[in-house]
Amino acid sequence: MVMKIYNTLTRKREDLLPSEEGRVKIYSCGPTVYNYAHIGNWRSFIFSDILRRYLKYKGYNVYHVMNLTDVDDKTIRDSQKEGMSLNDFCEKYTKIFFEDMDILNIQRVEEYPKATDHIKEMVDITKSLIEKGLAYKSEDGSTYFSVSKFKEYGKLSKIKLDNQQSTERIKNDEYEKDSANDFALWKSYEESDGEVFWETELGKGRPGWHIECSAMSMKYLGDSFDIHTGGIDLTFPHHENEIAQSEGCSGVAPFVKYW
């Protein structure tokens, strides 16, 4: 009997039909390591663990990747408050995260990539999006994804941008841009970033939040894979932006079969 899985993309229960017979590739949005993970975070991580265990029980070969966000507005802000380097600060909370995982008996997945180890991949995707006319550089040196150029934007969250008011998650991710809906792929350096920056072909700065997951998922799982999990609060804008970036860069759809 074919396993059924609920797909947020279609709002339906569907037959689980992996791209490779007998093998399921999963990506889970992991923690931002700036504080202790809270109960809502753990609900998402426990769900992905149960899913992984059940798929293995059913005989599937599971390859599961969960990222660690170790550079963003929150990690920079709080590392400065504690007077620690970004690396030392994030290592502290990464260690605590894994200790808590063990307490909750959550199995380790195959890969735990860190955002800061994948800057090259983020730059390469951003350059590709610029070349394809899907991204642009603003006057302040930041690079943005042009949402209006991606015609299928909103297919996951079902949000109509004409009626969408700016949210905190959108506002906090942007500097100067052409449209309120556009989001940062690369943020130009500001003094408030302190020592956190990379000198790249995109200029001196750091990655936007959304590009991190596209870069890491595509590196380890390819341009299209089976299942993506994460908190419901990430459906918009984070997961919606992941789809736009990834499909815009690779030209392959769907980026993910089951959300």
Question: Where do the PLM segments sit?
Answer:
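Short, glycine/charge-rich beta-strand/loop segments that flank catalytic centers
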Residues: 68-72, 94-97, 107-122, 140-150
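Residue-level recognition of the N-termini of beta-strands and the immediately preceding loop/turn
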Residues: 62, 109-111, 225, 256-257
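The substrate-binding groove and active-site-proximal loops of carbohydrate-active enzymes
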Residues: 80-86, 110-116, 203, 231
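Alpha-helical recognition segments enriched in aromatics with Gly/Pro capping
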Residues: 1-34, 45, 49, 121-259
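Short, amphipathic alpha-helical segments
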Residues: 87-91, 95, 113-123, 177-180, ...
